[in-house]
Amino acid sequence: AIAAAIPARHVVGCVVHVSWALQAPGAVQHHFGNKLILGEPSGQQTERAKALAALLKRAGFEAPLSEQIQRDTWYKLWGNMTVNPVSALTGATTDLILDDPLVRDFISQVMREAKEIGARIGIPIDQQPEDRHAVTRKLGAFKTSMLQDVEAGKPVELDALVTVVQELGVLTAVPTPFTDALLGLARLQARVKGLY
């Protein structure tokens, strides 16, 4: 419905590096972060992207322009596609997820699958899962957005975070047994709770 209403030529990509929580209707609590990475799908530094970045900077955001917004999007997804559903399944904050060696190894396997998919679609990631875990570790003990949604009884964004990667695995002929297991477990939990 959105794609029909807004043609792709009117879209500027944005990767959000901010943590908020909805406390009540109209009341949002800011936890950390202030970065909104902007970029045209073409990678060009257009006037509209520059104007949008300037507007966001005046509003107090860090708003860098990216020449590779697809890579920035994939990199964020690469971390979120694991810790979000695992936190939703377990109720654990990110520090507890990374502290458990079996869980950390499992999510690393999922990330290796996604890394291979990224390479096949032209969005290589030059890091290893442990490098990304170090980034997540710096954020401290926090509840992911998916865990917050489960606790609030809201639908989970499983398709945007995990299903899409599993589908890309099929399209690129990358085996995804770990991603499949994560998707199956998270989807079943969400269905049982009426959140998917």
Located regions from the model:
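Active-site-proximal catalytic alpha-helix in oxidoreductases
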Residues: 70-98, 102-115, 141
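FAD/FMN-dependent oxidoreductases across multiple families
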Residues: 46-84, 130-131
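Short, hinge-like loop/turn segments at secondary-structure boundaries
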Residues: 28-32, 81-83, 195-196
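Short beta-strand and adjoining strand-loop segment in the mid-core
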Residues: 26-53
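NAD(P)-dependent Rossmann-like dehydrogenase/reductase catalytic/cofactor-binding core
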Residues: 47, 96, 108-196
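Generic beta-strand structural signal
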Residues: 9-16, 34-36, 59-61
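Glycine-rich beta-alpha junction loops
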Residues: 15-20, 42, 69-73, 81-83, ...
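Rossmann-like NAD(P)(H) cofactor-binding subdomain of soluble oxidoreductases
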Residues: 1-27
